[in-house]
Amino acid sequence: NPGDSFNLIFYIENLSPWPSANSVYLNLTSDNIGIEILNNNQYVDIIESDSIYDNLLNPFEIIVSQDIEVGLYDFNLNINSSNQDQSYNKDFEISIPVTLFQSGYPYDTNSQVSSSPLAIDLDDDGSLEVIFGDYAGLIHVLSADGSSWNENLFPYDTGEQIWSSPAAADIDLDGLVDFVIASKNKHLYGFDQNGLKFDYDADQFLIGTPAIGNIDSDDELEVVIGGYTSSGDVFAVNADGTDVDNFPVQINEKIWKGVALHDFNGDGLDEIIVTTDGDDLIARVDGSGSVETLLIADDKFRSSPSIVKSGNDYVIMAGSYDDRMYAISSSGEMVFEIEAGDKVNSSASFVDLDGMVYAFFGSDNGLLHAVDLNGGDLAGWPQEIGGSIDNSVSFADLDGDGSPEAMIGVAGQLYAFHMDGSLYNYFPIPYEFSFTSTPLIADIDQDGDLEIISGSAGALVSVDVMEAGTIGSYWSQDRGNNQKTGYYEVTESECSSPLLGDVNCDALVDILDVLMIVNTIINESAITDYQAWASDLNQDQIIDILDILMIVNTIIN
């Protein structure tokens, strides 16, 4: 990576029957600006015939400039030796890539990863695990370094393609975070750190992402997902894998993508917003099983609905194959619609810019849009980036300057834009395979900078931004949060620069914040919404010892 240093080790074989090589000189050079070789000359007294020499104990030390461009860089190793009346002189050319890839990545799957990754502390050790599925039908759980986590449990083979992203929360309130994911084998799976908790057979293709919310009156959470068959059931599943009362609800519509959840009427229960791939509906389903049609479009929906609340107003957005992005109220009145010029597969993602909410989405004509809640364009947008845009945007403040960036993968390019539409340094980043999932932005290795993690047609890719950034309260992953509810709320924050772990909002994460979290846990004291958010470092909606471990680890490292 730019700014890194590394050791370069060579293995030099002197083949038999050639004689021993005496007085061997090694000279490593590079003509590239930004590459500094600290010890470019080495001397070897002798390399015996039929033996191999290596410079493990004296490697070439190389420093890469922080300002170097990403790309391939050439080195030349000259080997010069003499033996009695014979001499040997040969140049060997090698190329070393300078990339922004995180150590341990790309993680090769040999199959497409449409599942947007999830990062949670699954095993309560203060470190994040990365969870995703692939087209080979495997559910992967990786440690932060890209190695497989608990190979006795994962990867878990479902036997059929996985298009779904995982969702996570402590569904059964047992103190352990759970995650759920669906497979095209018609099953919904629930796991915790100990392995499989339930296997729900929907008897319908499940290709959308499950969402976790509160659908009934008990304390535990429920999982909601739609089926992709002609009957198009909406399923609500309890923590033990049984059906919630009044579910499944048959709406006779195929559901291609995930649902959105929110409690619109303040009764403590979430309503379900679905989009359909048949009669082209945006519909609302409540816990009683009743279905209300909010909008009928002119063509199918293959994007998830997204919900934003600004002030007292709700806006539901979804893109259609009739080339429009629709924005409606919670009761179905049209707020605005955008003529996108081509099919809209991309779901809306939201960002708050100084109290003004903007929705980002793409269309198949290669335009990436950013509009306010009246349908007006953000200055500098739309951006034409080419290729069909099937994925959605994620946001984070990559460089810690207080302003977010927008990230998305399209074809074989990973983009990061400033809010004025200009590109972030080093971006777009090319990759050999097309990017096929919405990116997750997280500090998975907890080194203070952020990683952009996304699925591709053959691997899971993680790009290390290498600047001190923050995800804050941004829409930084598929569907906006770990529970995949597709809901975003703009509220006046008592903290002007929100930062996970900075409970007292002094722009520092330190022992004072640890003490505040400890006090909250021990005394169950009342805290503000911001303090609750900043204390919940693993974003599992529970403030507990796991959050203390994570904040202590952040401070130490």
Kindly give the residue locations of the regions a language model identified.
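Short beta-strand elements of extracellular/lumenal beta-sandwich folds
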Residues: 3-18
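Extracellular acidic loop/turn motifs
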Residues: 15-19, 124, 524-528
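Short acidic/proline- and small/hydrophobic-mixed sequence motifs that coincide with surface turns
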Residues: 17-24, 244
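Intrinsically disordered, low-complexity Pro/Gly/Ser/Thr-rich segments with frequent PxxP/GP/PP motifs
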Residues: 36-68
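Terminal connector regions
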Residues: 60-96
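Extracytoplasmic/lumenal domain signature
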Residues: 93-494
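Cellulosome-associated attachment modules in secreted, modular CAZymes
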Residues: 493-557
